[in-house]
Structures are given as C-alpha cells and as structure tokens.
Amino acid sequence: MKKGRNYIKTALFMSAFFLMSNMLSQNDVLKLLPGSKKANYYESNDLLKLEGNVHFEYQGNTMYCDSAYYFEKRKIVHAYGKVHIIKERINMFCDSAFFNGESERAKLWGNVRVRDLDYRLTTDSLEYISTSGRAIYRNYGTIRKNGSNEQIVSKIGYFYPESKNYFFSDSVVYTNDGIRITTDTLSYEYSNQKTIFNGKTHIRKDSMKMICNYGWYDTKLNKGYLHGDASYEDSSQVLYADTIRYDEKIQEIIAKKDVHLINEENNFVLHSNFLYSSDSLNLTYITDCALAKLVQNKDTIFLHGDSLFIRNDSIEKKKNIQAYFGVKIYNKDIQSVCDSLWLSQTENQIKLYHNPIVWSENSELKGDSIVILTRDSIIDKIYVYQNSSAIMELDSGLLYNQISGKNIIAYMKEGKLNKTDVNGSAVSIYFPEDEEKTDSTTTIKRMGLNKLISSTLSVYLDSGEVVGINYVNEPVGIFYPMDQIKEKDRWINNFKWNPALRPKDEFTLTDR
C-alpha cells in the first residue's frame, strides 16, 4: 500500500459558479465603464449595443469583451469576442457568453477558461442553471491545479455549489504526481473530501494497480473501498476479492468474499473469504475457507485451517505461518492433520500440535507433537514426540507393521519413508515376508508376527515393509507363526488407523 493524499480542492468551482449565481439573482442594471468605443441604444428593441473594448459592470461583476448586447427588460446579456469576467479573485474567459436573468441560465462558449489562484478549468462550453444550482460541461473539460501536476479530465461534468457535490462522467481520468485514476463516473463530496466511482475503475501509482467496478476513496483520511471484481497489485503480490477496504495511512487492507492473494516474490498463494493485512504489524490473517499454497522449487504444500496468520521475514523474504483449528496439509509426499500448526520457511520447519497425524504412502505417524524438517524445499525428516507411533498398512489393510516408543525420528528419501529411529520404550511389530519359488512363479507369503522390545530401535523400511532392524541393547523378541497369532498380540498399545481423516487432495482441503 502506498501513502499519498490525492484529492481535489474545489475552491475554483465553488467560486466560479457562485459568481454566475450572483449574476443571475441580483437586480442591478448594467453600468458602462470607460473604455468602450461605441454604445448605441435601440429603444424599440430595448437593446443597448456596445462595441470596441467593451468594459462594464453587471450585477457586481466586471466584464470585458469586444461587443455586448444588453436587453434590460428581459434581463439578457450577450457578450462576444475575448470575453473576460472578473469576480474578486476569479477570472473567466470565453469567446462568447449568454446570461438570462428570467430563466436563470447562463452559458459560456468557445475556449472556456475559469481560473483562480489555485485551479483552472478549460472546456468547450459551460452551462449554469440557477434553479437547480447546477453547472454543466458536456464536451470534455480539464481541471488543473496551478503549480502542480494534479489534473482531472472528463467528457461531462456536473457541479452543485450549494450542496458542494460534483460529478464527472464518460472517460474520466484523474492524474497527480504519478497516480492515475480512470473510470466511467466519478462523484466528489466536498464536505468530507470523498470521491465515489461507478463503473470499471483503474487506479495506478508507481508499481501499484487497483481495479474495481465501483467504490469510494476518502481523500482526507486516505481510506478506500473497492467493490465488484476488485483487485490490488503491487510489485510483489496481487490481491483479488469481491470487496477490498484499504487504509493507506496505517497500511491496512481488508478483503472479503472470494479472496485470492498471489505473492510471486515468496511463491505462495492464499485463498479465503476474509483477509486482513497490516504492513505495520507485518501480518496477514485469513479465515473462512482459508487455504495457503506454498510453492518451493518443484514441490507444493497446501495448508488449510480455520484461521491462518502469515508473517513476513523481510530480510530473507520468507513466510512464517500459524494455523489454528481443523488444520490440514496436503503434499504429494505427505499429508497431515492437527489442531494447530507453526510453519517457518526461514527455519525450514513445520510444527504440528494437538492430535497430529502425518501420512506418507501407506504409513501413518502419530504423537503428542510432530516436527517436519525440510532440506532444499524437500521433506527430509519427521520428529514425533511423546506417545509416538508409526503404522504401515500391508495387504490392503489386512495387516499392519507397527512401531511405537517415546520419540520417533522418521527419515524420508525421495518422498518415501525409509527409516525410523525409536528412542525410549521401543516396540516393533511386523510381519516378515518369505518367497516361495516354483518353476514359473514366485509367491510371497507372510511368515508370521515378529515383536521386538528394546530401549532403542532403528527400523529400515521399503514401501512399508520392514527390511532391517538395528539395535544397541539386545532386544526382547518373540515370533508367532501366522496361525498362532493372538488378537492382543497383533497391536501396539492404543493402536488406531485413521484413513478417513487423511486429506485426499488439495481441492477438498476446505471441506468440512
């Protein structure tokens, strides 16, 4: 979000149009001043014709022109050629002007210019209707601030001096010191310095771009509201939403409904129905179908939770994410659930708390807490703390290899679980295989159940099958042939297999 105060002062318009209002409402007669070369009065037509360096006062306004026609009874003045009207510090110029006191209308034609100490308006023609307090230009007008780059251009402009409201339509363009706003219609409320736009609107300043279908901008408080296909873009990210509220002064953004934030600098995408972002707090918060997509080299992690808090590491340009309630992770190599999570791209860690479960291929890891470590954006190790277990499904769920202990370190290789180190009260239950070969076939059969108990165990795995076990202290072991296995011996303590909880893909992560 960029800071700035881009608003239009309206002293020029108010003064100019109150000038015309005075000209139409006062009852003074025309007062001829020295300088006019020729004056003729035609009584039959009630016409005073002035020619040559015409200089007169009418209803409190000083006027210059090449020629003028004054109809006193009808309260009409026609002025032609180099028309110049002065009212205090206001100057108005045009090729011709018409004033009708009875209908309370005034119109200026040809190279119309209105200026004061601050602003100047140029247009082809200008009309003022005193009864409605409305001034109009219909064939393009340009407003510029003296001594600056501030400018607004539109095909049509309406001004309401009494209510201090102004309206521009058709090809409206506002520019000032690098900012450019283009829209179909723009209203300006002088009392609270608010611009209101309707129709497709584009706002650009330096690397910042904003788009919406309608909304408003408070130029005094530097607050804005964008609605309808709204977007906000800067050098590092793009935000899309149905509505976007932003506060440039305190650097905050609030987005609602169909929110999508794409950060190309840090390679992540956020989706939700509500987003709050604060540059000063270094925080982005999303909720309501919240989903984060983290792209790391060729690997992608999808993260869902009821609430996600994202903080920036401005030095390393990485993200730290906290997720709460109903947390789910989907990755091509692992999937997980828990109730709270802390993810640090800076430290290459994902910490899972409160009933965490991690799945990899046919393996399921559980514990009181789990820490996932990555190396070069690839999942490297998984630490499982307290009441730890690893379960590997075999033969389509008929059997399960199982490991349990106080703590477990699971090692990943090419996205697959290939080793576990169990520390403290280590237990391993597995079903070794045996090959029976005939002349034409090889049959794999389960030999039985092997159970080992030790203080520590290192178990080597291949697709969930135990291919080797190392130990420091001699374990206690027992083997049961398949036909002698008792039900109580088949399971580690607190065995539970949880396939229904496992995230299936990134598209259903936000499903409840």
What are these regions (language model features)?
Residues 23-512:
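N-terminal amphipathic/hydrophobic interface segments
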